[in-house]
Curated annotation (Swiss-Prot):
Coiled coil: none
A Pfam family hit: Ribosomal_L27A
MF annotations from Gene Ontology: rRNA binding; structural constituent of ribosome
Gene designation per UniProt: rplO
Organism this protein belongs to: Nitrobacter hamburgensis (strain DSM 10229 / NCIMB 13809 / X14)
Region (Disordered) residue spans: 1-43
PANTHER family: 50S RIBOSOMAL PROTEIN L15, LARGE RIBOSOMAL SUBUNIT PROTEIN UL15M
SUPFAM superfamilies recorded: Ribosomal proteins L15p and L18e
Descriptive protein name: Large ribosomal subunit protein uL15
Function per UniProt: Binds to the 23S rRNA.
One CC-aspect GO term: cytosolic large ribosomal subunit
Keyword Ribonucleoprotein appears in the UniProt entry: yes
GO biological process, one term: translation
Length: 161
């Protein structure tokens, strides 16, 4: 027996059906697509159409809206801030603000400002300037001997001052 003698068992691999190759092929003329019309053509799918049944996107009610005045804060928790201080990317002696957090890479971008949240604990005595802070975060920073200054909301660059 040689490697070239090895073959599949008869009927174990079925040949694929080539459609639209004459009536003798068994899948000629319309090629399994039924009669004429839109769905007999290539690439046709009517998006959202469910065969006449009321489509899902029309059965469900409209909900909510997009507030154009929404302000998105970059959120930072106390444990993340403490990790950055331990790693040396933030100087505990200088004021911690949005600019220093972005510069150190702790926050990616602070377009709407930074909001301080209270998960974890802080050991360093810090002076923090942020645009928002939770009560628990303020309490934890003050317990460690630091201060939190809440800044006024950031104005849009496009807005007249």
């Amino acid at each position: 027996m040689k490697l070239s003698d090895i073959a599949d068992n008869a009927g174990s691999r079925k040949k694929r059906m080539r459609i639209g190759r004459g009536i003798g092929s068994g899948k000629g003329k319309t090629g399994g697509r039924g009669g004429k019309g839109q769905t007999a053509r290539s690439g046709v799918r009517i998006k959202g159409f469910e065969g006449g049944q009321m489509p899902l996107h029309r059965r469900l009610p409209k909900r909510g809206f997009n507030n154009i005045f929404r302000v998105e804060f970059a959120e930072i928790n106390l444990d993340r801030l403490q990790d950055a201080i331990d790693a040396g990317s933030i100087d505990a002696k200088s004021t911690v603000n949005a600019e220093s957090l972005v510069k150190s890479g702790v926050v990616r971008r602070a377009k709407g400002g930074v909001r301080l949240l209270g998960r974890g604990e802080i050991k360093a005595k810090l002076t923090i300037e942020v645009h928002g802070a939770s009560k628990s975060a303020i309490a934890a920073v003050e317990k460690a001997g630091g201060t939190v200054k809440i800044l006024a909301p950031k104005k849009d660059e496009g807005e007249a001052a």
